[in-house]
Amino acid sequence: MSNKPTVSIVLCTYNGEKYVREQLDSILKQSYPIHEIVIQDDNSADGTWDILEEYAIKNPLIRIYRNEGKHGVNPNFLSAIHRAEGDYIAISDQDDVWEVDKIANQMSCIGDKMLCSGHSRPFSTDGSFAYFDGRKRNVNIFRMMFLGLP
C-alpha cells in the first residue's frame, strides 16, 4: 500500500457534453494515483448526464450526483467538495483538459502548503492557444475560491 497522500478530483458539470469526454479522459490518464472523481451535475438539459453515467459504469473511481434543480456554479462546487474524501482536492472545470502529470507535479510541490496551483494554457474551441499581453490582473485567488470569479 502506498504512503502517498490521496487526491480527490472534484468537477461540476452543466450542459457540458461537448467537452466532458475529453476532460474525463485527461483526468483518468493522470500519472499520480487518483483516489476518486466526484462529479456533480447541475441538472444538465443536454447529453452530459448520459456521458457521466457511461463513464461511472466503466470506472469505479467515478461517483456522480445530479441536482434536482439548477443550483449555480458556486453552490454546486461547494456541495461536490463536501462529498470528496481524499487528503487533497483538485478542482476541475468542465472544459479543462489536463496534462498527464498535472497532479503529480502539484503533489511534488505542495509540501505543507495550503494551496498549490499550476500553469494553464487557455485555448479556443478550435484548439488554438490564447495568449495574453503580460499585464498583471487584479485577481485574488481566495476571492475566486470562496466567492466565485471576479
PLM segments and residue spans:
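Nucleotide-sugar donor-binding/catalytic module of glycosyltransferases
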Residues: 1-150
